């Protein structure tokens, strides 16, 4: 009976808890996807804007001839000054840019704040990263100005078209870390960005920068998306991976957003519901067991009283706890026993009176007989 009553409640409770957990997980996953798309969109806006602005600076016939100049005449000097002015204006008006430099191996051009002559680029990190590509994004090692602490800087590297086989020119644009942070960090989620699926170039926790990003087991590179639980730092977290293909380059940005509290909240809610279900099952069960034991005790008491009455023992209990059908039955039994007891008492009283009457009659007969006997006869 208990199992029959509890089993439906148990099934409904388990189904409800599973449904609530599924809905909460789907809701958090939806929020995580939205935040991942927001971060990817912000990163795309920054990188696309920087790349498009560099197009405006470089896509001109002046750059073709300027960096191929064999001498510094007045015309070349004017072009060089105009380009330097354009670079300075762009640097001052673009908050996302931390530095902008053009490196060339043309010795005929004068050095300026943003244009530098360099005889060889082979050993430079940015040149190694560019390789044979015309443009690429890279995470380059930089140092703070005062204490010389190292940090990684997201950098656009572009090869500049030069109308000469002897000379080369390259544009290097470093992005400002604070600007990137202000655009990306707009929620409580932890954000991590990897360039081409290798080292982390940006992270909410700066300790992770430079380390390899952790991917799920099914990660195979290129365009990748995943939303769900994953172990991060020896803890299960709700994560979202989204891939951003950079504008006019072959780079892929892998954006990972992590909600550190989602699974904790879900598990806590499920635990509360499980506790409620256990209480909903346990409290009625305890009450039913107590009531059943109480009811069984009263049944046993009533049965014992009826059994004693059936054997002619009418000395049963006077009180019977409760106010239900069993109490009414006991009252009826008590009335019946009392009635039988009264009848028996009346019967025995009648028998006694009858016996007393017989005794009285016998005494009278004896007295009459005694009065008829001659005393002299008795004497003789």
Q: Residues of each region from the PLM?
A:
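Membrane-proximal alpha-helical signal-transduction linkers
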Residues: 287, 291-321, 330, 334-337
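Cytosolic-side ends of inner-membrane transmembrane helices, especially those
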Residues: 13, 17-18, 276-296, 310, ...
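Extracytoplasmic/periplasmic ligand-binding sensor regions of membrane-associated signaling proteins
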Residues: 77, 81, 89-175, 180-183
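Membrane-proximal, non-catalytic sensory/regulatory domains of signal-transducing membrane proteins
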Residues: 127-162, 213-251
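Extreme N-terminal signal-anchor transmembrane helix of membrane signaling/transducer proteins, especially
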Residues: 1-22, 26
């Amino acid at each position: 009976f208990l199992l029959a009553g509890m089993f439906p409640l148990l099934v409904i409770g388990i189904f409800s808890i599973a449904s609530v957990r599924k809905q909460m997980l789907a809701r958090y996953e939806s929020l995580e996807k939205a935040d991942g798309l927001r971060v990817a969109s912000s990163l795309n806006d920054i990188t696309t804007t920087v790349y498009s602005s560099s197009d405006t600076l470089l896509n001109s016939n002046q750059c073709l001839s300027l960096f191929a100049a064999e001498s510094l005449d007045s015309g070349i000097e004017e072009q060089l000054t105009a380009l330097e002015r354009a670079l300075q204006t762009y640097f001052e008006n673009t908050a996302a840019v931390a530095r902008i430099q053009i490196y060339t191996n043309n010795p005929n051009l004068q050095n300026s704040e943003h244009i530098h002559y360099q005889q060889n680029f082979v050993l430079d990190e940015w040149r190694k990263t560019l390789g044979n590509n015309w443009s690429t994004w890279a995470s380059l090692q930089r140092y703070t100005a005062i204490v010389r602490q190292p940090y990684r800087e997201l950098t656009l590297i572009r090869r500049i078209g030069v109308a000469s086989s002897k000379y080369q020119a390259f544009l290097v644009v470093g992005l400002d870390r604070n600007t990137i942070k202000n655009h990306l960090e707009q929620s409580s989620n932890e954000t991590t960005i990897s360039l081409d699926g290798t080292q982390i170039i940006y992270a909410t926790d700066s300790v992770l920068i430079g380390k390899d990003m952790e991917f799920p087991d099914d990660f195979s590179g290129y365009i990748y998306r995943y939303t769900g639980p994953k172990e991060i730092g020896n803890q299960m977290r709700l994560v979202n991976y989204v891939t951003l293909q950079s504008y006019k380059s072959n780079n892929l940005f892998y954006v990972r957003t992590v909600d550190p509290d989602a699974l904790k909240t879900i598990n806590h809610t499920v635990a509360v519901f499980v506790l409620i279900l256990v209480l909903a099952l346990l409290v009625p069960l305890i009450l039913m067991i107590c009531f059943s034991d109480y009811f069984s005790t009263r049944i046993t008491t009533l049965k014992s009283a009826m059994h004693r009455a059936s054997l002619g023992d009418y000395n049963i209990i006077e009180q019977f706890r409760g106010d239900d059908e069993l109490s009414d039955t006991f009252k009826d039994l008590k009335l019946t026993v009392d009635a039988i007891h009264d009848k028996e008492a009346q019967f025995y009283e009648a028998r006694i009176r009858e016996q007393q009457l017989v005794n009285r009659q016998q005494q009278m007969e004896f007295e009459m007989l005694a009065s008829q006997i001659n005393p002299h006869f008795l004497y003789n």
